Amino acid sequence: MGALTKAEMAERLYEELGLNKREAKELVELFFEEIRQALEHNEQVKLSGFGNFDLRDKRQRPGRNPKTGEEIPITARRVVTFRPGQKLKARVEAYAGTKP
């Protein structure tokens, strides 16, 4: 199983919508840049029928160096999380054949 790349997304836009290759690539880049900028400005990104990107603050916590076993602090940080929407979950479950 492979991974979908931005180049493949641009190629699909080229094939399906008739955009030229440069326009298709720019559209994909602009889409992801909008998501990045929203997250940089502490905004939630809601993509209807797909899911939400959120920022979450993680507190400092104790960790351990796996080589030495020494306890070291893991610093507080902000992370991006993705929560899939119900429609996306349903499609993935139906495709995977694991729908309850």
From Swiss-Prot:
Keyword Phosphoprotein in annotation: no
GO cellular component: cytosol
Residue ranges, annotated region (Disordered): 53-72
This protein's UniProt keywords: DNA recombination, DNA-binding, Transcription, Transcription regulation, Translation regulation
GO molecular function per UniProt: DNA binding; structural constituent of chromatin
Residues forming coiled coils: none
SMART domains: BHL (SM00411)
Transmembrane segments: none
InterPro entries attached to this UniProt entry: Hist_DNA-bd, Histone-like_DNA-bd_CS, IHF-like_DNA-bd_dom_sf, IHF_alpha
Keyword Transcription regulation: yes
One GO term of the biological process aspect: regulation of translation
Quaternary assembly: Heterodimer of an alpha and a beta chain.
Protein name: Integration host factor subunit alpha
Species, as recorded: Stutzerimonas stutzeri (strain A1501) (Pseudomonas stutzeri)
Annotated gene: ihfA
